[in-house]
């Protein structure tokens, strides 16, 4: 749950004289932990203050009948299979968080549903980033509010 330390996350950003740069890694690691670590190192080397990943359970978000986006059509897998291959399990997220901490770069992760939110709370995140597609998801936002963590809210 939220703590004084967690509220310092937003204070730390607000009191800066320079922009706070969050490197969006998202799912570009393709489910590969080593690639994700290389991306963290690249973000750090580029001057980012923070890296941000995405956490989700594909089966809870995507129908097995969902059509593929244009860029996905070259693959034989379904959209669900493609996105599922980018999932990071809780233990992988914990490893990435610890790796980022050891490299002195902040770790954030956007949860897309309640299970992912609860998993991120278990590994200890300083804030919750809400994606714009969840901005009207009242049950999810209620769960987020119960964490008492600072929230970064995308609007589009």
Predicted regions and their residues:
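Catalytic domains of carbohydrate-active enzymes, especially glycoside hydrolases
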Residues: 38-56, 123-124
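Glycine-rich, proline-tolerant flexible connector loops at the mouths of alpha/beta enzymes
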Residues: 49-87
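Active-site beta-loop-alpha junctions enriched in small/polar residues
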Residues: 26-28, 56-58, 112-114, 133, ...
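Active-site beta->alpha loop and helix N-cap motifs at the rims of alpha/beta catalytic domains
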Residues: 73-138, 146, 150-153
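N-terminal amphipathic alpha-helix/helix-capping segment at the start of soluble metabolic enzymes
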Residues: 1-23
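Short, acidic/polar
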Residues: 32-43, 111-119
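Short beta-strand segments at enzyme active-site cores
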Residues: 22-23, 48-60, 106-111
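Conserved, mostly hydrophobic/aromatic
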Residues: 24, 43, 120, 154
């Amino acid at each position: 749950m939220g703590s004084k330390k967690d509220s310092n996350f937003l204070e730390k950003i607000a009191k800066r004289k320079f922009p706070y740069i969050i490197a969006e890694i998202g799912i570009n690691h393709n489910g590969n932990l080593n690639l994700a670590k290389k991306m963290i190192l690249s973000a750090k080397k580029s001057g980012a203050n923070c890296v941000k990943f995405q956490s989700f359970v594909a089966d809870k978000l995507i129908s097995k009948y969902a059509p593929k986006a244009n860029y996905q059509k070259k693959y034989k897998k379904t959209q669900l299979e493609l996105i599922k291959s980018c999932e990071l399990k809780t233990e992988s997220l914990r490893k990435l968080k610890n790796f980022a901490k050891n490299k002195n770069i902040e770790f954030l992760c956007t949860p897309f549903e309640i299970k992912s939110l609860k998993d991120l709370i278990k590994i200890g995140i300083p804030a919750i980033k809400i994606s714009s597609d969840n901005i009207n998801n009242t049950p999810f936002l209620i769960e987020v509010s119960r964490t008492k963590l600072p929230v970064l809210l995308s609007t589009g």
